Amino acid sequence: MRCPSCQFNGTRVVDSRPVDDNKEIRRRRECESCGFRFTTFEKIEETPLVVVKKEGSREEFSREKVLRGLIRACEKRPVALDILEQLVLSIEKDLRRIGNSEVRSEDVGELVMDRLAKIDEVAYVRFASVYRQFKDINVFIEEIKDIIQRQTEQKS
């Protein structure tokens, strides 16, 4: 590897350790010519996960976009940001585990709603109202009845 200080094409690894849940390797390197030390990161290049929208257009999966939607749904709710970040990572992990490079936006939305319902029901209803485009109060009432029904079934 080329030294960023003197451009010499020879370095040695001084230290190497896994980071980011063993998804990356952090390496401390030292130039064999000038002794300059610097850090590099090595990680697996993942194929992009493409979301196929309802109208057929395609866009790369965006953790940030999903997180923004979750943050908006959880506004003024007692849900910590790190929980939402972990939720987004687990959703992406599950989508990648399916093995397809393309996923339908409906599948992403349903997965988000399923996970969010287990964290905060109010945030779930907020998210569902935007995602499913609730037209009137009756749709909200039906969704809340479904939540109550699920709670009743879980208790028995």
Curated annotation (Swiss-Prot):
The keyword ATP-binding applies. Residues 49-139 form the ATP-cone domain. One of its GO terms (biological process) is negative regulation of DNA-templated transcription. A zinc finger (unnamed) spans 3-34. The keyword Mitochondrion does not apply. GO terms for molecular function: ATP binding; DNA binding; zinc ion binding. Keywords: ATP-binding, DNA-binding, Metal-binding, Nucleotide-binding, Repressor, Transcription, Transcription regulation, Zinc, Zinc-finger. InterPro entries: ATP-cone_dom (IPR005144), NrdR-like_N (IPR055173), RNR_NrdR-like (IPR003796). Binds 1 zinc ion. Pfam families: ATP-cone, Zn_ribbon_NrdR. Its cofactor is Zn(2+). It comes from the Bacteria. Negatively regulates transcription of bacterial ribonucleotide reductase nrd genes and operons by binding to NrdR-boxes. Belongs to the NrdR family. PANTHER family: TRANSCRIPTIONAL REPRESSOR NRDR (PTHR30455:SF2). This is Transcriptional repressor NrdR. It comes from Lysinibacillus sphaericus (strain C3-41). The gene is nrdR.
